[in-house]
Amino acid sequence: MPNIFKILLIVLLAVVSFRLSASTGDKKTANDGSGNNSSAGIGTKIKRIVTAGLLFTSLATGGAEAIGRSNAQGGNAAGLVPSHLTNRSMAPPPPPAQFEKGAATRVEKMRAQLRELAEKMTDKDPKRLSPSGPDPHHH
């Protein structure tokens, strides 16, 4: 079971990093000289991606915890495992507590990284809008 969530988290990280690397190319042409910023929306796009990532990871941990709990009771969460496998008396039940702790800390680390990333992006936004132009607060 934990492998599914590892794969999902890796895919999520790959998507986020790909989108970030794709959007950094615009920074060179962000300021067109007249003070108009052609790529002002990048920061908000990144924020949206990060919040989507946070939503996704919280859903993933919720699912992981549900599966861990129902496996402890000998049940089958959302029919992910065929019943003839779960009902076998030979198969020892997985250790759900250990798995839940592992998944939770892993996702917490990821959430922290995403939050830091979001903060970095929001810090850069005002400086990037007019690096050589007048102070953005004085219009």
UniProtKB/Swiss-Prot annotation:
Residue span of region Required for secretion from the host cytoplasm to the host apoplasm: 23-90
Residues carrying covalently attached carbohydrate according to the record: N37, N87
Keyword annotations of the record: Apoplast, Coiled coil, Differentiation, Glycoprotein, Host cytoplasm, Secreted, Signal
Region (Disordered): 66-139
Domain of life where this protein originates: Eukaryota
Coiled-coil region: 100-125
Keyword Signal: yes
Tissues expressing this chain: Highly expressed exclusively within the dorsal esophageal gland cell during syncytium formation in host plants (at protein level).
Biased composition range(s): Basic and acidic residues: 106-128
Motif CLE positions after renumbering to this chain: 128-139
GO annotation, biological process: cell differentiation
Subcellular location: Secreted; Host cytoplasm; Host extracellular space; Secreted, Extracellular space, Apoplast
Function: Mimics host plant CLE extracellular signal peptides that regulate cell fate. May play a role in the differentiation or division of feeding cells (syncytia) induced in plant roots during infection.
Family in the record: Belongs to the CLV3/ESR signal peptide family.
Miscellaneous: Failed to trigger CLE-like cell fate regulation in Arabidopsis thaliana, a non-host plant.
Protein name: CLAVATA3/ESR (CLE)-related protein 1
